[in-house]
């Protein structure tokens, strides 16, 4: 009996180690601007034989519809890896350094995910935060809000929220009132909340209603008039421009590749990130 128990314990320990070494891939949902930017910048998006772009994210990936869900999942699983807006980073997870060099080995320079490295272009996984609107549907109130976001005051909030600000534009406050309906992605949550609060404090007669969705829904809503302003955590697509949208970049953001704080890995190359998220690399031992 003791021999059987020892064998059983050995099998359990072996299985536990194997499971700990297996990579648990965590992804955002289709329609997410963060996912669209991530797969493009890391090479997870590839072209098929006909030249069509295909998202090659592994079918084994766990898919979540918001930034907080991805972050929580990774924080609770030592084998997990995911990606979130750099502006949403906190101490619950660890951001990996990323090497722009697509091949592993000597010469790879691992760069920390920071606003400074995004601004300099040294950090490879970065994307714009865009707003978009239909010019013929834009109210004076919504236009003033956009102008204020691009002002020194609005861009100071951008910087305070760990995003990369633009050169501020001149702003002349207007006497405005009314409601602004905005559709945004979850990645824009921390920033949008601060911008909304500050603008409403300056303009008590303005009510900003924010509907949380994803980037694609935000762009569709702006095009069909459901939203005054749509917000996307990616580039605005050609099809969205053809629908009559006018895009405005409000800042730049990095996409942090995150792991559990208990994970010993400190950095990955773009090639390794691609291979993990396409299912070519399945064990942490392959990148340690």
Describe the role of every protein-language-model region.
Residues 19-288:
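Exported/periplasmic ABC-transporter solute-binding proteins
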Residues 1-8:
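Positively charged n-region of N-terminal signal peptides that target proteins for export
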